[in-house]
């Protein structure tokens, strides 16, 4: 291994190494075909066709920070209820970052309108006695729609003469479809429903534009549960978009996470949250600095959050994203991050061949 002139050169090589463009097109073409087929079939359901209001690519692909084989996709499909501005949104004070959706005014309005007769019948089945939308009732309707579609497709899809098997599962708020063609080609798609709401209905933050309420279930799948997670993906995209080195460092932090077994509980959204907070504190010009300076800063921020066992949800500080993690896990992640940060700082001061190898090992599963 040739010794590089400085740490910046090493980090540039790492940044180039984690680019996945080579395989992106193969997966993307198959995924586009699956996505279009599934949505076209779902819209044959009269009720879902009425509620469906487009979709957006979410997760790492939507943010353009995917670093591994492109085999996982997140799709948020928007649900827009009739008279949606009449939905009364209130904060769930027992679960920060979550909201309740009260359909009382919606029911009163559409009950008088014949064109809403069918959707009204279904909507009443999804509400509790106080007209709050219930997470599992609504999710079971969507589940039935996906199962009907996949059954009609015989749980298979053919693209360019090659047939793949399809398997359905519920993963958190997502309706997940696993696609398998061979041992060397498989991927999954998380279809996540997002109930569209307006900026003036947001009770957790001051925002511009629409946002979504995500039907994220409780661990016990309580059928009476009526609390939805507030999601601001559009606003988050704007914050991290066109920020020079931001996405390069973001990808590298994810690659660090992926290469360390004791970091796998550091969710992608947690890493994203660190960048959202950093963007709120720094001037736009900050992201034009060298990779070396920014990545050491981000390791320090991650280290600080783990040491304090606190990472506030960007849109509601009362929610600590680390809340469900045990102290032992936090210490394991802290030790890993601290070690990486120390290596980077040493390499920034004086790069040697052993240090260079250790820097590569921070981001890649290499044996020295």
Curated annotation (Swiss-Prot):
Binding site for GTP: 190, 229-236
Recorded superkingdom: Eukaryota
Example GO BP: immune response involved in response to exogenous dsRNA
UniProt-listed SMART domains: Mab-21
Protein residues bound to ATP: 60, 72-74, 233-236, 254, 268-272
Regulation: The enzyme activity is specifically activated by double-stranded RNA (dsRNA).
Any Pfam family: Mab-21
Cofactor(s) needed: Mg(2+); Mn(2+)
Top EC group: transferase
Enzyme Commission numbers on file: 2.7.7.-
One of the record's GO molecular function terms: 3',2'-cyclic GMP-AMP synthase activity
Catalytic activity: GTP + ATP = 3',2'-cGAMP + 2 diphosphate; GTP + ATP = pppA(2'-5')pG + diphosphate; pppA(2'-5')pG = 3',2'-cGAMP + diphosphate
Classification via InterPro entries: Mab-21-like_nuc_Trfase, Mab-21_HhH/H2TH-like, MAB21L/cGLR
Annotated keywords: Antiviral defense, ATP-binding, GTP-binding, Immunity, Innate immunity, Magnesium, Manganese, Metal-binding, Nucleotide-binding, Nucleotidyltransferase, RNA-binding, Transferase
Positions with a binding annotation for Mg(2+): 72, 74, 190
Biological role stated in the UniProt entry: Nucleotidyltransferase that catalyzes the formation of cyclic GMP-AMP (3',2'-cGAMP) from ATP and GTP and plays a key role in innate immunity. Synthesizes 3',2'-cGAMP in a two-step reaction through production of the linear intermediate pppA(2'-5')pG. Acts as a key sensor of double-stranded RNA (dsRNA), the presence of dsRNA in the cytoplasm being a danger signal that triggers the immune responses.
Family: Belongs to the mab-21 family.
Protein name (Swiss-Prot/TrEMBL): Cyclic GMP-AMP synthase-like receptor
């Amino acid at each position: 291994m040739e010794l590089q002139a400085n740490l910046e050169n090493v980090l540039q090589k790492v940044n180039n190494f984690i680019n996945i463009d080579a395989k992106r097109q193969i997966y993307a073409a198959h995924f586009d075909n699956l996505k279009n087929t599934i949505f076209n079939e779902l819209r044959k359901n009269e009720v879902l066709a009425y509620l469906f209001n487009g979709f957006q690519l979410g997760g790492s692909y939507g943010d353009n920070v995917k670093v591994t084989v492109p085999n996982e996709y997140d799709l948020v499909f928007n649900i827009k209820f009739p008279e949606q501005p009449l939905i009364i949104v209130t904060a769930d004070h027992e679960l920060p970052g979550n909201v309740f959706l009260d359909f009382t005014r919606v029911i009163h309005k559409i009950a008088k309108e014949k064109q809403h007769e069918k959707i009204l019948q279904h909507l009443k089945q999804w509400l509790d006695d106080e007209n709050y939308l219930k997470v599992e009732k609504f999710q079971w309707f969507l589940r039935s729609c996906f199962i009907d579609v996949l059954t009609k497709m015989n749980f298979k899809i053919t693209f360019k003469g090659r047939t793949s098997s399809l398997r359905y599962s519920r993963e958190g708020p997502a309706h997940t479809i696993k696609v398998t063609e061979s041992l060397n080609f498989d991927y999954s798609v998380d279809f996540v429903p997002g109930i569209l709401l307006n900026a003036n209905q947001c009770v957790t933050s001051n925002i511009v534009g629409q946002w979504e309420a995500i039907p994220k279930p409780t661990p016990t799948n309580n059928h009476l549960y009526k609390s939805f997670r507030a999601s601001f993906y559009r606003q988050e995209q704007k914050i991290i978009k066109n920020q020079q080195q931001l996405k390069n460092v973001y990808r590298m932090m994810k690659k660090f996470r992926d290469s360390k077994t004791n970091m796998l509980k550091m969710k992608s959204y947690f890493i994203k949250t660190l960048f959202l907070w950093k963007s709120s504190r720094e001037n736009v010009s900050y992201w034009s600095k060298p990779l070396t300076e920014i990545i050491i800063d981000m390791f320090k921020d991650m280290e600080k959050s783990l040491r304090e066992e606190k990472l506030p949800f960007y849109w509601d500080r009362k929610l600590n994203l680390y809340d469900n993690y045990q102290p032992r896990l936090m210490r394991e992640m802290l030790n890993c991050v601290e070690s990486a940060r120390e290596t980077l700082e040493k390499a920034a001061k004086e790069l040697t061949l052993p240090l260079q190898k250790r820097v590569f090992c921070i981001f890649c599963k290499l044996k020295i």
